[in-house]
A protein has these predicted regions:
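Acyl-donor binding region in acyl/amide transferases
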Residues: 1-103, 108-117, 128
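Short, well-ordered beta-strand micro-motif
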Residues: 120-124
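Long, contiguous binding/interaction regions
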Residues: 127-136
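Short, cationic low-complexity segments
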Residues: 139-147
């Protein structure tokens, strides 16, 4: 998306459209990946460890990359994770996913071609906080009818 269109209203419109799709097709969970800038995992160890220790998906949603692509996320012990620094340095998209209720897989993939490290994201619909459902649902019906 072009930088000039990355504002709050555009993101909200995208989320309302996603929510309309989820409702229309009765989807149980949304999955995908999110990227952390950088391929030197020693520089993003605190962020990866934070996701591993504090925001890991439940066992029934757990997944990890293929062994040949797997990068360990548990790089710093839970007690040594600088939570404040991790939260401040995580990409806005990952923080947004976390606010809504998303969780993360076990293991990351370094993508040198794009200069990022990717993590698996799962958002079971049943775990989305009610306030977000109410917020994004106000226009969802209109979007579904227009489609």
């Amino acid at each position: 998306m072009l930088a000039e269109y990355r504002g709050k209203k555009t993101i909200e419109m995208l989320w309302r459209g996603i929510w309309a799709y989820v409702k229309h097709h009765r989807i149980d969970a949304m999955i995908g990946c999110a990227s952390i800038e950088g391929t030197d995992v020693s520089l993003i160890a605190n962020q990866l460890s934070f996701l591993y220790h504090f925001s890991q998906a439940a066992p029934e949603w757990q997944t990890s990359p293929l062994a040949r692509r797997h990068t360990e996320m548990n790089r710093v012990s839970k007690g040594d994770v600088d939570v404040k620094k991790a939260l401040a340095s995580l990409p806005p998209l990952i923080k947004g996913y976390m606010r809504v209720g998303a969780k993360f897989g076990n293991g990351a993939v370094v993508d040198r071609q794009f200069g990022v490290t990717d993590v698996f994201v799962v958002m079971p619909i049943s775990e989305i906080e009610t306030r977000y459902i109410e917020y994004f649902d106000e226009d969802a019906a209109a979007i579904v009818k227009a489609a």
